[in-house]
Amino acid sequence: NDFFFSRHNEFWRRNAEKKLPELLSATGMLACGEDLGMVPSCVPGVMAHEKILSLKMRGMEGEGEWNHLSVCATSSHDMETLRMQCDTDPQPWEVRNMLWEFLNSPSMLAIFPLQDWLALDAKLRRPYRSEERINEPADPHHHWRFRLHLDIDAIREASSLNVTICGLIKDSNRYIIK
């Protein structure tokens, strides 16, 4: 246990403090660290010091205890979509409420898979939520097989969905007029 959880913390911290500033200064991009699961205990402190956004996912530890230096998401490509995470297939109004919670979080960014946005419209989302998953790492025959069932024109022309999405974003004050 000591080998995995504490013996190498100082090693990882020193190396991160040496390498990260140079990497971060090489670009003007905002950095986000994938800090989910088993990570050395020094990681949150190093990320905060370097102003690297942490990743916050629905159902993961510390849900709802997010600060501004984070990206919140309903799921990732390796997880179940929002509809799949629920015991029963949620109605569009329930999906709206769940997305609203994320949009109202203090996280700097809120990023959702397209499947979760489409779940706001019963006619546009897939009929079976089990078909929405992008990747299932535990299944060697299910790698990256997801294909969107709509073309971009159908999404662009879905005025009700687009009005709903724009309203959620504007009402959460994540919308900036330029």
Model-identified regions with their sequence ranges:
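Catalytic cores of glycan-processing enzymes that make or break glycosidic bonds
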Residues: 1-178
